């Protein structure tokens, strides 16, 4: 065997000599990489043969077998890469000669030859290379118009409002556009946002550190000198720790190769010792990391300051794997076992006040050390603890659920439900289910979860002062899940141990009635005891609401039925000494918003129709029924000939108003409109509030649906409606704006603006005097806007009943061909801008300067949400140039306002372009004096422009303006000092 290998090796060497050692040995007769790898994996190549091959290739032959193999494999792969590069170049030259020799075809077909290209990418390149299609598609992108990146910078709105915010920042950094990150505050927001520990985030931070450091290769004219990570190492360590960002801290330390002593010093100076003591899951991760690189000062030892936030670290809503990690991080971070051993050696443990906790904890740690995470299935690790302990996926208990005793062990129980049962044992396969617990290899999962919780609680009891033990009371859920007592006994413990607070009452009843699997008879007994005043000394009247809510929200028909029957019996036997309970009809109506399935509605309809208000004629209760059940509710109510009452002034949940209003319009035979006593003036105010609440949920189609099927008697005042949508935190309402201005031309707007009343004697001119009425014409497409109300989609046309034309006060039911709306000039221009109709704006500027640049209107256009305030740098510069070209006593104010906005937003390039123009810079950015009357602005006005850039922390722009504008030395020094104080 070895002799054969030698022959193959000799052949390799000869081949290498002939080919300048550039071959990878793939040809016939050679020891090829493929054959070499196959022989090794099959076990036919022994250690001695590997050494011979390595020596023949000039490689080291010492070390373990796998190490020698890796060297040889690396040799083959490096040869292959080199040959591929050489061969590719040779092949390209050969192909080029062939192409020159052959006649060129008239039309060349491009074919992708890569084998690993995704199918979608192939389509992309086909489109990319088709000039006609490419231009059509990319003409829809309005990056110059919006340019939200330079408009808002890297603040919390960008970070939290855009799912691709990291990619946006990366693109801007790579293109050396540092407008996206203007100051250290932006970077702190980034550190607070991007914490995921994956390759993408790690690469992002490495890019960030490389560009914002003293060694950066970024052009000096672009890099903001105020941001350099390596200039304040200790401060950035502090910020990353306090923002609990493990990924940023880890990459920061590695990138700048920070010594552990430097980290210790930074922590000692800038981090309070109690910071890590107030333990959270992520803080433990950072603490253990710093401990692993020997960077925790002795003053910050965790054990001496530790306290635990039970509500987050040990929540039963956490995944099982998080509980395991929390336990390990807590035990590892404190060196608990080492400290225990030291105490034991010193004999201190014998007199330790918490000795009993130490012994129990030590036993639990030994038991948990025997358990490996690999023993659990992925399903178990990624399930919540509550879900695993409840045996079933949290859901409402159905009427067919068996009332046999529920089990807390892994023994499978037979129920008549089809609910998904989780595996409660550790098993050797990946199955999520188990039907037996007799196998010795199976371990009860509930007991393991309990051990983890128990160990953490014992750890706390062992490490804290005995006087503070009452602070670390085990949470109520731990008691409910792990104590094997009857429900009535559990409730007594709630009263005694947890003082029976409202929160504990609510938690107890919700878990007992809805989540925890307990024998149904015990739940019945608890209901009976509460209603029979067994707990009268502890159960207060204010707790009744909590109790009723828990019963009705369970959506368990058996439970609700039993509750209502006992309550009815109590009311029949009621005496002055007993608790007075609400009548059944009121209770059902008050808690009907908890109904989440049709069966509950049917139950009330069949058994309590006459007692409750739910199905009465012209009732208001229907508004509380969940939208997903409203169609079934309508069917039940209509089946007995009753109608629902729609009273706009008694509506309490405006976020659901439009969906319900559209239903009433669609089914006027089932709903009765009660708009009596209202006046038309109030409708705009009411409708604005309803629109505001619906824009947050992006329900613009609901708004359009209503306006398409209700003939308004008076123009709709849209300015305040759209005003609220211009807030950066809200939806832009582009769909609604397109709907309004769909068929309104610039000529029709011009006509309306011409007749506007420009005369006013009011010095404090109000915007209400600058409004116009426009008419929207609805097309067939518009009037059939789809809306989703009950889970099924239908068009507005199909939803309408045959009964149309009903006058309901504010409007007349029925499809409308057009409607009028009132809009202010300021909002009009903003809407045109949003619709990318800037050419129309310029058209109106040219046609109606006396209207749009009227001095009385100037205050309107200094607001934040005006045309110039929302413009991107591209369009703001366009407006600035327009005012320069059309300069007069009116436009000069608008020009100055735009320059102030550009300064505040840090649009540095606008000012660079002005400076580069000798003509513009002389009268825009030079001080107007007696000797220089060609300049437009005084020293104070130009000073204010600079101050706005300083206040916005745009120091690059500030320095640019200070250096160029001819301020006095005193004014320059004052401005520079202001920059220093702002840093």
From Swiss-Prot:
Keywords carried by this UniProt record: DNA-binding
Start and end residues of each SAP domain: 42-76
InterPro entries membership: SAP_dom, UPF0746_actin_org
Biased composition (Basic and acidic residues): 1-21
Low complexity bias: start-end ranges: 392-413
Segments of this protein annotated with the region Disordered: 1-26, 391-413
GO molecular function ontology, one term from the record: DNA binding
Source taxon at top rank: Eukaryota
Assigned protein family: Belongs to the UPF0746 family.
The protein, known as: UPF0746 protein DDB_G0280809
Protein source organism: Dictyostelium discoideum
């Amino acid at each position: 065997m070895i002799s054969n290998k030698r022959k193959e090796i000799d052949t390799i060497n000869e081949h290498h000599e002939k080919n300048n050692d550039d071959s990878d040995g793939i040809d016939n007769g050679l020891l090829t990489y493929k054959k070499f790898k196959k022989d090794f994996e099959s076990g036919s190549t022994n250690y001695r043969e590997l050494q011979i091959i390595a020596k023949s290739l000039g490689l080291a032959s010492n070390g373990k077998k796998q190490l020698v193999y890796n060297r040889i494999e690396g040799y083959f792969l490096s040869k292959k890469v080199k040959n591929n590069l050489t061969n590719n170049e040779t092949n390209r030259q050969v192909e080029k000669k062939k192409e020159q020799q052959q006649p060129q075809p008239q039309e060349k077909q491009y074919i992708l030859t890569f084998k690993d290209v995704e199918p979608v990418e192939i389509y992309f390149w086909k489109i990319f290379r088709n000039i006609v299609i490419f231009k059509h598609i990319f003409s829809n992108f309005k990056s110059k118009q919006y340019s939200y990146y330079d408009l808002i910078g890297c603040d919390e709105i960008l970070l939290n409002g855009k799912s691709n915010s990291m990619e946006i920042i990366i693109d801007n950094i790579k293109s050396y556009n540092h407008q996206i990150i203007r100051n250290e505050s932006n970077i702190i927001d980034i550190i607070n946002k991007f914490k995921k520990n994956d390759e993408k985030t790690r690469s992002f931070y490495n890019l960030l550190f490389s560009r914002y450091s003293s060694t950066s290769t970024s052009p000096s004219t672009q890099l903001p000198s105020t941001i350099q990570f390596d200039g304040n190492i200790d401060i950035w360590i502090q910020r990353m720790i306090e923002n609990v960002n493990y990924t940023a801290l880890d990459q920061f330390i590695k990138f700048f190769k920070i010594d552990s002593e430097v980290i210790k010093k930074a922590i000692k100076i800038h981090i309070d010792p109690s910071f890590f003591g107030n333990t959270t899951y992520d803080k433990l991760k950072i603490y253990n990391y710093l401990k692993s690189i020997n960077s925790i000062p002795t003053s910050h030892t965790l054990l001496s300051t530790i306290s635990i936030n039970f509500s987050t670290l040990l929540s039963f809503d956490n995944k099982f794997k998080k509980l395991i990690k929390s336990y390990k991080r807590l035990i590892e971070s404190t060196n608990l076992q080492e400290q225990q051993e030291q105490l034991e050696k010193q004999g201190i443990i014998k007199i330790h006040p918490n000795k009993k906790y130490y012994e129990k904890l030590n036993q639990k740690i030994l038991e948990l050390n025997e358990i490996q995470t690999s023993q659990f299935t992925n399903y178990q690790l990624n399930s919540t603890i509550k879900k695993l302990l409840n045996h079933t996926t949290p859901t409402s208990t159905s009427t067919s659920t068996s009332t046999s005793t529920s089990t807390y062990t892994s023994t499978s129980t037979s129920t008549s439900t089809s609910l998904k049962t989780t595996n409660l044992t550790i098993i050797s396969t990946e199955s999520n289910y188990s039907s037996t617990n007799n196998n010795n290899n199976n371990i009860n999962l509930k007991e393991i979860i309990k051990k983890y919780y128990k160990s953490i609680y014992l750890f706390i009891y062992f490490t804290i002062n005995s006087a503070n033990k009452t602070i670390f009371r085990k949470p109520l859920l731990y008691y409910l899940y792990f104590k094997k007592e009857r429900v009535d006994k559990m409730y007594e413990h709630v009263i005694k141990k947890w003082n029976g607070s409202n929160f504990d009452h609510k938690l107890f009843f919700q878990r007992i009635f809805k989540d925890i699997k307990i024998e149904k008879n015990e739940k019945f007994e608890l209901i009976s005891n509460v209603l029979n005043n067994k707990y009268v000394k502890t159960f207060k009247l204010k707790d009744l609401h909590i109790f009723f809510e828990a019963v009705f929200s369970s959506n368990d028909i058996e439970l609700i039925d039993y509750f209502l029957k006992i309550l009815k019996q109590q009311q029949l036997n009621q005496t002055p000494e007993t608790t007075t309970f609400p009548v059944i009809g009121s209770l059902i109506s008050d808690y009907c918003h908890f109904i989440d399935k049709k069966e509950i509605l049917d139950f009330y309809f069949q058994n309590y129709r006459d007692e409750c208000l739910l199905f009465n004629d012209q009732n208001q209760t229907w508004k509380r029924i969940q939208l997903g059940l409203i169609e079934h509710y309508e069917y039940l109510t209509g089946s007995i000939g009753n109608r629902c009452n729609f009273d706009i002034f008694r509506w309490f949940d405006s976020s659901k108003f439009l969906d319900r209003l559209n239903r009433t319009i669609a089914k006027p035979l089932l709903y009765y409109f009660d708009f009596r006593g209202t006046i038309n003036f109030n409708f705009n105010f009411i409708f604005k509030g309803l629109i505001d609440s619906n824009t947050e949920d992006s329900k613009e189609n609901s708004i359009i649906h209503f306006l398409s099927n209700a003939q308004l008697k008076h123009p709709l005042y849209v300015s305040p409606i759209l005003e609220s949508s211009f807030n950066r935190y809200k939806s832009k309402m582009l769909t609604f704006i397109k709907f309004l201005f769909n068929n309104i031309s610039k000529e029709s707007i011009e006509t309306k603006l011409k007749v506007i009343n420009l005369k006013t004697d009011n010095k404090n001119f109000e915007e209400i005097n600058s409004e116009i009425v426009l008419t929207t014409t609805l097309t067939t497409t518009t009037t059939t806007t789809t809306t989703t109300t009950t889970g099924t989609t239908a068009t507005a046309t199909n939803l309408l009943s045959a009964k149309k034309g009903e006058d309901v006060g504010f409007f007349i039911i029925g499809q409308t061909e057009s409607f009028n709306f009132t809009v202010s000039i300021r909002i009009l221009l903003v809407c045109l801008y949003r619709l990318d109709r800037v050419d129309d704006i310029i058209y109106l500027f040219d046609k109606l300067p006396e209207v749009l640049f009227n001095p009385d209107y100037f205050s309107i256009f200094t607001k934040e949400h005006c045309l110039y305030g929302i413009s991107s740098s591209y369009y703001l510069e366009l407006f600035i140039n327009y005012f320069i070209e059309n300069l007069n006593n009116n436009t000069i104010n608008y020009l100055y306002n735009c320059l102030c906005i550009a300064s505040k937003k840090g649009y540095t390039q606008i000012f660079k372009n002005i400076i580069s123009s000798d003509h513009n810079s002389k009268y825009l950015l030079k001080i107007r004096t007696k000797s220089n009357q060609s300049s437009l602005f005084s020293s104070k006005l130009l000073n204010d422009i600079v101050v706005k850039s300083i206040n916005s922390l745009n120091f690059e722009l500030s320095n640019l303006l200070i250096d160029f504008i001819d301020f006095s030395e005193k004014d320059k020094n004052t401005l520079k000092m202001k920059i220093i104080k702002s840093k």
